[in-house]
Curated annotation (Swiss-Prot):
Subcellular location: Cytoplasm
Major localization class: cytoplasm
Motif 'HIGH' region mapped to chain: 131-141
Enzyme class: ligase
Catalytic activity: tRNA(Arg) + L-arginine + ATP = L-arginyl-tRNA(Arg) + AMP + diphosphate
InterPro entries in the cross-refs: aa-tRNA-synth_I_CS, Arg-tRNA-ligase, Arg-tRNA-synth_N, Arg-tRNA-synth_N_sf, ArgRS_core, DALR_anticod-bd, Rossmann-like_a/b/a_fold, tRNAsynth_Ia_anticodon-bd
UniProt-listed Enzyme Commission number(s): 6.1.1.19
Protein name: Arginine--tRNA ligase
Gene Ontology annotations of biological process type: arginyl-tRNA aminoacylation
Source superkingdom: Bacteria
Gene from which the chain derives: argS
GO CC, alphabetical: cytoplasm
Amino acid sequence: MESRRMLKKIISNILKEALKEYLKDTDVKDIESYIEIGYAVDDKFGDYACPVAMRLAKVLKKNPLEIANSITEKIDKKYFDKIEVAKPGFINLTLSYNYINECINDLINNDDYGKNTVEDKKKILVEYVSANPTGPLHIGHGRWAAIGSALSNILKYAGHEVYQEFYVNDAGEQITKLNESVKAVQEGREIPEDGYHGEYIKDVAKQDGVPKDIILESQKKLLERFGTHMDNYASELKIREGGELEKTMDFLDKEGLLFEEDNAVWFKSTKYGDDKDRVVKKSNGTYTYFAPDITYHKNKIDRGYHYLIDILGADHHGYVPRITAAVRAVSKDTASLKVILGQLVRLYRGNELVRMSKRTGDMISLEDVIDEIGVDPTRYFLLMRSYSSSLDFDLELAKKKDNDNPVYYVQYAYARICNIFFKLEEKNMSYDDNKPLDISKIANESSLKLAKMILRFPDEIYEAAKSLEVYTLINYTYEIASALHRFYYDNIVLEENAEIRQERLTLIKAVKKILGLCFDIIGISKVERMWSEE
């Protein structure tokens, strides 16, 4: 665990040992449940804070300040310069310069820094986007594409085995409507009222090939351009026509999970927590859309994935209990499913809501947005909020080339570091790339804040993988950028004093590495030169 440099976990273990000693003559059990390590609310209180004394006060019937002082006496001091107690009973801990040096030098020299932070490694299949091949991907699909790929990268970095998949809804009535719409254009007729009316239908009609295949290929190319790389595109049509669907229904029947009523076949989903049983085969003998969905999820499990993540739009909220029941049934409760319901995206130009796309006749397409503002701003903005919150996306802000634009702000931090090293070379100033950091030689408020900020990286990865949230890593990149810009304004990095210059350059070299790792994970470019360089 030490090599992973998860400081919250390391500090938690230190507190645990101190608590064992302090509580050895009491009846208190499950010591770890009382320990929570957080960041101090203000730098003047230290780096980390623990409220364990207040949690124990009720159990021990003692004053929390008295408990905190007693625990503090038993804490191993080797990682800390200062351990203090603050009202009403917080234990505040400040990292030592020696330990900061040790961690940052490890960060610089270790390619696996912050990797493999999870102990319970899983084989995970993440299914996302899964759009109908009937039209361009809209901006909502773009949000799921950004979240799905960034989350997959986080899970991989944390140590899980991850497979990314797009389920192609290439069967059913919508495909018939697509074919009829394209044929109508080709024959110079009016598109049926319930058909697809976007301008893109004319483009599809001009091409040779099957309409759904043409559209799917364009979706694949756009996702690749967007930095979303699927491992597989699974076909609903193959599930329906390849015999797999019938085999799954036979499996459920043998398990006693199907019954007939009103000439239809029903799945006993209430047995697994759904509010009502669901039809899988209609009275006319055709399967409902739910039947291939059950089959597809069984297919995932049969391939060895027992932890499934589905990223869906919020309009699928009623679907969650039934598909969760299906996964429990087909896996015999050996697999688990997490459904992430992403909320909608509202596009603005300043204060004006952008409502329609002329090209698609529907929601604004992802390609329209990328063409206008670029991949990096699109990805970053779509990742800025929790998936459970709706997102207001200002296209004008995303195009700005100043610090009001958050993606510019964070990329400029990376470019600023690169520019400093370019200037170092231009000025032919000395720097020893192999010399370890000694933070004590440059210890001021901004350098210490920056150093301690980048040391949070392993914890940020671990917590993002645990919560399945990406926006926390976006916030973290912004905090690093803010600390870097503050450091830059407070300190002359290319200082004439070679000793000070050495330490400041080593510190920002470490910052560059962490920002680069964050950018790779969230899927934005590591830009080395920008238009506003000093």
